Amino acid sequence: MAGVIKLESDPRITVLALSWRDIKAPKAGGAEIHTHEMLSRADHKKIRIIHFSPLFDSALPDETIDGVRYLRQGNIFSVISAAHAFYRANRDRIDFVIDQCNTHRFFTPFWVPQEKRIFYIHQLTREIWDIQATFPVSTLGKHLETPMLRMNRNDRAVIT
């Protein structure tokens, strides 16, 4: 894994958005388009947006698209620890963290203070588990969805 990027000081509010795919990912779909559109429409004079997701073949590890800085590290599994390391190295410069729930989670209640967490539910995935995974992972995923959603009930905000 590449070294941890240190953010430069910036007077703007800094929002770190965590997602398992970004707008350029090979399997990007509606969630990624929606997320990019929301983030790109922020007032970038007041808000610095950093989107963190896994690196994929042909992707730049660091690029800016429509005012959103895209950082890519790790893979579908290691991106969580990469995001955690990035947050820890920059926590004093990050004001809010958006954990996007779209099949994949970043488990921010374990490493981001409650007052900084924003939980964004793009879609619930109970019915997707049988399509995307095989037994026993599919059964485990379906049964853990509701208890795992409860982890975020005390976040600063929950967006659906």
Predicted segment positions?
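An aromatic- and histidine-rich active-site surface loop
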Residues: 79, 96-128
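N-terminal subdomain of nucleotide-sugar transferases
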Residues: 1-55
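Hydrophobic anchor at the start of a short beta-strand
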Residues: 47-50, 117, 157
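Membrane-proximal helix-turn-helix segments that form the acceptor-binding/catalytic region
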Residues: 125, 137-158
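Generic beta-sheet signal
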Residues: 73, 120-121, 160
